[in-house]
Amino acid sequence: MNLLEQYSQDPQFARLLAQEELILEVTETLCALLEKEQVSRAELARRLGKSKGFVSQLLNGGRNLTLRTLADVLSVLGYKLKLQPEKTDGQGGRGRMVT
């Protein structure tokens, strides 16, 4: 059993891992949408009425992304969010975000 498998047996670690995986998936999805829509971070900040620093922190995972903020970002890009939870084996893991 490798170290990750050992840690995955710890429920607290599994929850933290699931949180970090979700943050990564959301921020990667937002970055992909920006690229697809050819919207710069500066333009996103302008559309949101926020600073460029705010957007950078948001997309780098350094700022807690609330559901309201996520909805705002998706809205100004012309998208909405549909969640599709997936059952895990009880050791963490993530569902899927569908835009």
How should each PLM-predicted stretch be described?
Residues 85-92:
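Short amphipathic recognition helices of helix-turn-helix/homeodomain-type DNA-binding modules
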Residues 68-84:
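DNA major-groove recognition helix of helix-turn-helix/homeodomain DNA-binding modules
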Residues 38-54:
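Short alpha-helical DNA-recognition segment
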Residues 34, 45, 74:
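The alpha-helix within a helix-turn-helix
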Residues 40, 66-69:
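Residues that mark the N-terminal boundary/hinge immediately upstream of a DNA-recognition element
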Residues 1-32, 92-98:
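N-terminal flexible/basic segments that precede or flank functional cores
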